[in-house]
A protein has these predicted regions:
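Alpha-helical substrate-recognition element adjacent to the catalytic core
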Residues: 2-121, 126
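C-terminal cap/substrate-recognition subdomain and adjoining C-terminal extension
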Residues: 77-91, 98-230
């Protein structure tokens, strides 16, 4: 019986070649955002508290935001990966602890308007200030987007392939059926014994996805257990 997969894909540092929120803060952030970052890195505050405080320190209007976002590059193989996932019947969602509007604008530039985006919301007040809302937060999770809750809610009958690179993916990686991992997430998977394959980018992910759906090939070249459902 062929395993049915869904794909949850991180954005910052995974699809994009840089962290979009950090890029916005470096260009438009008022003093104080780095101190919040230091508090988060040190574990004194959670990711949601950090991001909410940092977004409130963004300066500049929508045009200024667009100028920064329109310089952000994505992995050149990502569009081909999206096409392959669609052809294979694998629903793909962007699940990010970043900001929805920047992600949507960047993806739209590459013709990817159709991808579902589950992320924190970037809002602008009547007074022209930026703020963040977290509709996908959970009371027992410090992240703005609880990726574990998202995974549980999205087509639970399908096995989950997670693609990511960093700390916001650590918790959900332990619950996913398989992880395509890079950078910090790769180190975490290795240290925690989580089923994974290492990638440098989406060229690698394309090759691995082909292997994943070809059982005869996978048995010889993809030495990972096929998820078993009761």
């Amino acid at each position: 019986l062929r395993v049915q997969w869904k794909i949850l894909c991180d954005f910052d540092g995974t699809v994009s070649l840089q962290d979009v929120t950090d890029t916005l803060l470096e260009r438009l952030g008022q003093p104080g955002w780095r101190a919040l970052e230091d508090d988060w890195v040190a574990g004194r505050i959670g990711a949601r508290e950090c991001m909410s405080g940092q977004v409130a320190l963004l300066d500049g209007d929508v045009d200024a935001l667009h100028r920064v976002l329109d310089e952000v590059r994505i992995d050149p193989a990502f569009v081909r990966f999206v096409d392959l996932a669609r052809d294979l019947g694998m629903p793909l969602s962007i699940v990010s602890d970043g900001l929805d509007y920047p992600i949507a604008r960047i993806l739209a530039r590459h013709g990817l308007h159709q991808l579902p985006i589950i992320a924190n919301r970037l809002l602008r007040t009547d007074a022209g200030q930026w703020r963040m809302a977290s509709p996908h937060a959970q009371p027992d999770c410090a992240s703005g987007t609880c990726k574990c809750a998202v995974m549980a809610q999205q087509e639970p009958a399908r096995s989950t392939l997670l693609i990511g690179d960093g700390r916001s993916d650590f918790c959900v990686a332990g619950k996913a059926d398989l992880v395509f991992a890079k950078d910090g997430l790769l180190r975490h998977c290795r240290a925690s014994g989580i089923a994974h394959r290492a990638i440098d980018g989406f060229d690698d992910a394309i090759s691995l996805l082909h292997e994943l759906v070809a059982p005869a090939v996978a048995s010889a070249r993809f030495p990972l257990p096929v998820p078993q459902r009761a």
